[in-house]
UniProtKB/Swiss-Prot annotation:
Gene3D superfamilies: VC0467-like. Belongs to the UPF0301 (AlgH) family. This is UPF0301 protein Pcryo_0062. InterPro entries: AlgH-like. It comes from Psychrobacter cryohalolentis (strain ATCC BAA-1226 / DSM 17306 / VKM B-2378 / K5).
Length: 187
């Protein structure tokens, strides 16, 4: 089983993954330690969930027109009513922590107000819900061949169109799913 810390890596759902909630999912791992793992799907836009509308529903005035068009993402099946802001920069917000040198996750409303005004957040994605794994659960799924691992990069995380991210992550590690055996991970 994996002993590596996969924080700031992508999990690429293998085509044979049996859980339909994660079909062709690309998950950014925010935390991976001895207690388990937490990640956010970063390739599933919620077509009916515009960031601006969600902010207005929280009584936050939106003055940045682009925010009205930005799509929120389905972060995962756990707690879909909870928002997580994945963003570049430093953990300077009320409820924020650094994932890597230049990627943070924040759950407090202070960042939402700055996003609404188009002020100083840099790249961001608002994810509703998250994916999580218990102690050693992710290691078992990796050993089972459910996921492939790819180092994270900011272009793929924030700039690549959502519908291209899963394949682009696979391409980045040299995987062609057309030739991938369903027996991956087994000797």
């Amino acid at each position: 089983m994996s002993k590596a810390n996969l924080t700031h890596h992508f999990l690429i759902a293998a085509p044979e993954l049996s859980d339909p909630r994660f079909e062709q999912a690309l998950i950014y791992i925010c935390r991976h330690d001895k207690h388990g793992a937490l990640g956010l799907m970063v390739n599933r836009p919620l077509e009916q969930a515009r960031v601006g509308k969600l902010l207005e529903d929280l009584d936050i005035e939106v003055t940045d027109a682009q925010v009205m068009e930005d799509l929120a993402l389905e972060g995962g099946p756990m707690y879909p009513e909870v928002g997580f802001v994945l963003h570049t920069g430093q953990p300077e917000w009320a409820s924020s922590f650094a994932i890597s040198e230049n990627v943070c996750i924040t759950t407090s409303q202070d960042i939402l107000k700055r996003i609404a005004a188009g002020q100083g957040v840099g790249h961001y994605q608002l994810c509703l819900g998250h994916a999580s794994w218990g102690k050693k659960q992710l290691d078992r799924e990796l050993a089972n061949g459910d996921w492939l691992v790819c180092p994270a990069d900011l272009n793929l995380l924030f700039d690549t169109p959502f519908e291209e991210r899963w394949q682009m992550a696979a391409d980045k590690i040299g995987v062609n799913f057309d030739y991938l055996s369903s027996d991956i991970g087994h000797a």
